[in-house]
């Protein structure tokens, strides 16, 4: 068993089984680290809690909803505005967050009255918003507040509102992944099947496990619209509360992030017979194959092929321009969950990068299995790393860039390594054909930034300003390519706009052919 023991964690021997170095000819039965277990006492984990997984990851991207946390303000603040899940309703869910602000007296005497008062105040403050999600936290779960009963009372008193209750306190799982499961099943049990659509087209999908980071969802919806597919709901990025209550009427669940949303897909299949189809919106070849799979399900392959041909012709020469300049650069792929396997093979094959490490903070064994299988010999795989282990890995592997979250990204920069935000992006969207070129552009800019040269200078030297001029990114990158590539008339840099989403929103999408209207919809299966 090729376990990798970090020097900094020798005092915690249990950590040894949570990191492996992939050896030559290794099969997955002998090179997987342990995963999705409780954090070992003594190691400072970078994980979030189950409440965070429910509210921050899945709940809050819903756009037309008052999201209120029943607990202390700290829980609310920690899950506010750290992910860029934009929406087409002026980003209401990003601008405003709500909390009941539970204090010591409420812990002693109960906080149900406070919750009810806060819910009414929130609805009064935003009279145009008629939907609300209430999130239970550790504090109010431990004192036994009956949030479901309070939600029912508020709905009865106001008449025109609807409230969803998410009971996912922080202790409900070993990481945020526990919260993913909680909110998936709670939404299905409480809300799916409670609203019927006015309109159903010939080809209808739910787009599941997509959170519209900097517009990812809107890019993918544009492809589906161009194929003549009606997207009934998106779970949950840029999705509306009531459309998600109609999920039972789709013909197909198209699943993007399996780690956070496979649970609701599997239950929709079991309860309503809706098939599940896993796709990948990152990378040219994975995305092209994903569009083909969806098209094949509906028998509209020609429409998918037309889109793929158009997008390849426009964006592939630009991707290849960056690939020539990124070949051989080493990357540590340290995101949260499924991106470690969504990205690992695509960035190697399509950008020329070499993945030297993958890690996950809340991924399960299945995520590691897929991630490690897509890495080459010598890749270091780590489950639930702490900061000191990450630093030791950086010193050992010497990556040129790291893809990770904002918190680890800050200490990564202190070690002289550039990072790109794998959770919320730098200049996204990164999904779609153009998005993948934007990602390559951001990698290129980060690796070849003159700031890296300046950061390495000893500015205390008296002649530093004279002897240490710096080169531009393009000058540095072009040192590594041939003249044929450098002066190619086919390959060229990214030509898209800074905001690639505004144009998508401005398009007039044709309504797909009608299959049946609401009065023809039969009651959902029990």
Curated annotation (Swiss-Prot):
Region annotation (Disordered) ranges: 507-526
EC number(s) recorded for this UniProt protein: 1.18.6.1
Co-factor remark: Binds 1 [8Fe-7S] cluster per heterodimer.
Keyword Iron-sulfur attached: yes
Entries under SUPFAM superfamilies matching the protein: Helical backbone' metal receptor
Keywords: ATP-binding, Iron, Iron-sulfur, Metal-binding, Nitrogen fixation, Nucleotide-binding, Oxidoreductase
Cofactor field: [8Fe-7S] cluster; [8Fe-9S-C-homocitryl] cluster
Reactions accelerated catalytically: N2 + 8 reduced [2Fe-2S]-[ferredoxin] + 16 ATP + 16 H2O = H2 + 8 oxidized [2Fe-2S]-[ferredoxin] + 2 NH4(+) + 16 ADP + 16 phosphate + 6 H(+)
GO molecular function, one term: nitrogenase activity
InterPro entries referenced in this protein's UniProt entry, alphabetically: Nase/OxRdtase_comp1, Nase_asu, Nase_comp1_asu, Nase_comp1_CS, Nase_Fe-Fe_asu
Residues bound to [8Fe-9S-C-homocitryl] cluster: 257, 423
Task of the protein: This iron-iron protein is part of the nitrogenase complex that catalyzes the key enzymatic reactions in nitrogen fixation. Other nitrogenase complexes utilize a molybdenum-iron protein or a vanadium-iron protein.
NCBIfam families: alt_nitrog_alph, ANFD, N2-ase-Ialpha
Family membership: Belongs to the NifD/NifK/NifE/NifN family.
Note: The structure of the 8Fe-9S-C-homocitryl cluster is assumed to be analogous to the 7Fe-Mo-9S-C-homocitryl cluster.
Protein name: Nitrogenase iron-iron protein alpha chain
Species classification: Bacteria, Pseudomonadati, Pseudomonadota, Alphaproteobacteria, Rhodobacterales
Gene that produces this protein: anfD
């Amino acid at each position: 068993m090729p376990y990798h023991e970090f020097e900094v964690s020798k005092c915690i021997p249990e950590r040894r089984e949570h990191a492996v170095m992939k050896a030559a000819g290794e099969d997955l039965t002998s090179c997987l680290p342990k995963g999705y277990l409780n954090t070992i006492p003594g190691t400072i984990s970078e994980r979030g809690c189950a409440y965070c997984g429910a509210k921050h990851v899945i709940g809050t991207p819903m756009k037309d909803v008052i999201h209120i946390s029943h607990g202390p303000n700290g829980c609310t603040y920690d899950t506010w505005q750290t992910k860029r899940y934009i929406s087409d309703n002026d980003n209401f869910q990003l601008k405003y967050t709500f909390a009941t602000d539970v204090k010591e007296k409420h812990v002693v005497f109960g906080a149900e009255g406070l919750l009810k008062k806060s819910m009414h105040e929130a609805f009064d403050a935003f009279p145009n918003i008629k939907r609300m999600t209430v999130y239970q936290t550790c504090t109010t779960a431990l004192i036994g507040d009956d949030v479901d009963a309070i939600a029912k009372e508020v709905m009865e008193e106001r008449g025109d509102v609807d409230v969803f209750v998410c009971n996912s306190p922080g202790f409900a799982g070993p990481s945020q992944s526990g919260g993913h499961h909680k909110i998936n099943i709670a939404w299905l049990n409480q809300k799916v099947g409670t609203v019927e659509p006015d309109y159903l087209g010939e080809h209808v999908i739910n787009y599941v496990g997509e959170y519209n980071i900097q517009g990812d969802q809107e890019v993918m919806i544009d492809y589906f619209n161009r194929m003549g597919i009606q997207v009934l709901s998106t779970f949950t990025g840029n999705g509306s509360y009531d459309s998600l209550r109609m999920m039972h009427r789709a013909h197909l669940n198209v699943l993007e992030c399996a780690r956070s949303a496979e649970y609701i897909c599997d239950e929709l299949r079991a309860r309503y017979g809706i098939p599940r189809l896993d796709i990948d919106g990152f990378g040219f070849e994975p995305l092209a194959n994903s569009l083909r799979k969806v098209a094949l399900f509906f028998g509209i392959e020609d429409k998918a092929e037309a889109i793929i041909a158009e997008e390849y012709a426009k964006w592939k020469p630009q991707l290849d321009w960056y690939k020539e300049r990124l070949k051989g650069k080493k990357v540590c792929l340290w995101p949260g969950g499924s991106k470690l396997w969504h990205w690992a093979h695509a960035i190697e094959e399509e950008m020329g990068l070499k993945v030297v490490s993958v890690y996950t903070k809340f991924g399960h064994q299945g995520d590691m299995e897929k991630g490690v299988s897509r890495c080459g010999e010598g890749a270091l795989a780590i489950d639930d790393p702490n900061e000191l282990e990450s630093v030791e890995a950086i010193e050992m592997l010497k990556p040129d860039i790291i893809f990770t979250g904002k918190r680890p990204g800050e200490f990564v920069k202190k070690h002289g390594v550039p990072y790109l935000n794998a959770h919320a992006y730098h200049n996204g969207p990164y999904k779609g054909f153009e998005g993948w070129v934007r990602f390559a552009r951001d990698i290129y800019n980060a690796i070849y930034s003159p700031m890296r040269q300046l950061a390495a200078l000893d500015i205390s030297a008296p002649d530093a300003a004279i002897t240490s001029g710096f080169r531009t990114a393009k000058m540095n990158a072009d040192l590594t390519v041939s003249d044929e590539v450098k002066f190619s008339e086919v390959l060229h840099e990214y030509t898209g706009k800074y905001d690639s989403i505004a144009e998508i929103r401005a398009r007039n999408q044709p309504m797909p052919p009608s299959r049946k209207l609401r009065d023809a919809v039969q009651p959902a299966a029990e």
